Amino acid sequence: MDPVNFIKTYAPRGSIIFINYTMSLTSHLNPSIEKHVGIYYGTLLSEHLVVESTYRKGVQIVPLDSFFEGYLSAKVYMLENIQVMKIAADTSLTLLGIPYGFGHNRMYCFKLVAECYKNAGINTSSKRILGKDIFLSQNFTDDNRWIKIYDSNNLTFWQIDYLKG
C-alpha cells in the first residue's frame, strides 16, 4: 500500500510522517537520517492535510497528496495515546506562518513536531550540535514511545493489525 492511502485509511490525527525526497536542496546539510517531517492534521472539508515547515514557506498546511510529491521513502509513527496526538495536531495550526529557521521565533520541521508534542505533554530529547540543541528524526525514531506503523522500505502488515486493535 502506498503511504498516502495508508495514512488516509489508518493513520490517526497527529501521526508524524518522515519523508525523504528524490530532490532536496537541504538534504546534504541535514544530519538527520530522515530528511523531512510533517504532522498529519487529519481532514478538513474532505481534504487530508499535513502541517510542515519548509525553508521556502515556513510553517504551512498542505494537502497530503502534495506533501508526497517527489517522495523517495516514507515512515509514519504514532503514540499509544490518541488524545495526545490530537492535541499536537491542533497545536500545529497555531504555529502556521512562523518563518523557517533555527533561531528564536523560527521553526524547522523537526522543531515544529517537537514543539507541538511538548504542548501536548510529550517532551523530546535533542542533540547538541555546534553548541545548539537541535531536533533530528532520530530524536523521535529512537524513542520507544513512538510506534512505527508504516515504512515504505519495509512493508509489513503487522502494523495494520496493530491499528485495528
Swiss-Prot record:
<dbReference type="GO" id="GO:0030430">
    <property type="term" value="C:host cell cytoplasm"/>
</dbReference>
<comment type="function">
    <text>Contributes to virulence in host but not to replication in cell culture.</text>
</comment>
<keyword id="KW-0946">Virion</keyword>
<dbReference type="InterPro" id="IPR038765">
    <property type="entry name" value="Papain-like_cys_pep_sf"/>
</dbReference>
<keyword id="KW-0426">Late protein</keyword>
<comment type="similarity">
    <text>Belongs to the orthopoxvirus OPG091 family.</text>
</comment>
<protein>
    <recommendedName>
        <fullName>Protein OPG091</fullName>
    </recommendedName>
</protein>
<dbReference type="GO" id="GO:0044423">
    <property type="term" value="C:virion component"/>
</dbReference>
<keyword id="KW-1035">Host cytoplasm</keyword>
<dbReference type="Pfam" id="PF05708">
    <property type="entry name" value="Peptidase_C92"/>
</dbReference>
<dbReference type="InterPro" id="IPR024453">
    <property type="entry name" value="Peptidase_C92"/>
</dbReference>
